[in-house]
């Protein structure tokens, strides 16, 4: 028969396991969910939702489809309908990009009523990255230079895509489940936007990412975790600051700074085509005229 000390030890182990399970069940990924009662018209969304994209996906798209530069953004666990996410998308699109935000989660977004572990098993970002290949292939077939970015859950998807030849640049914002080992396989320039008080991917883990990338030499990278940046995991896309009274002015500034950071990342590393599809017909005609004049003047010089 077990002694009282053994019983107490066993009970302590059970309580510790229960506490660990509870801690694991809660994640910063679930903090500050977006207000889904806010509609696109209230935010003056510039884009639209399209259906039947390659891979059977629907998506929020913004920007000129004729642009030679495309960005695929992967949402966090709350999905592609988050109001602030769409505002960020519109800002990036305004900078000259065609931006696609697929509904990788297919309407099954995470909330506090669902088991986090079970939900993740049903929504593997690694599998989602594989399923997205037809979309990336279609964008490349159109002659576009393609980049990928992601938030939280979407950060893991993005880093998986960054291991392939499907894109030319990667941007991670407070990623979830990304490891230093992932950095050993990334093939393209990568930007890592961390949060100061992120327990999901804390600054120390981001430093490990940087260490691996620095040792590799061949992959350009940047890390941003400035003091004026986001302080919490998911802070950038899980709220709608201009409509949420509880949201502070610094958060509004963070969203603006973040849009600029994402644009800066892609402007730095995503190649521009010489003849951009957005070039005006007048510019093209003028260019052809001057090239022709140069050619004929060169020809007549030898006649």
UniProtKB/Swiss-Prot annotation:
Signal peptide (from-to): 1-43
Any Pfam family matching the protein: DLH
GO CC, any one term: extracellular region
Broad class of enzyme this protein falls into: hydrolase
Chief location bin: secreted
Function: Plays a role in control of plant growth. Mediates specific degradation of cell wall (1,3)(1,4)-beta-D-glucans and is related to auxin-mediated growth and development of cereal coleoptiles.
Protein name: Endo-1,3;1,4-beta-D-glucanase
Species annotation: Zea mays
Lineage: Eukaryota, Viridiplantae, Streptophyta, Embryophyta, Tracheophyta
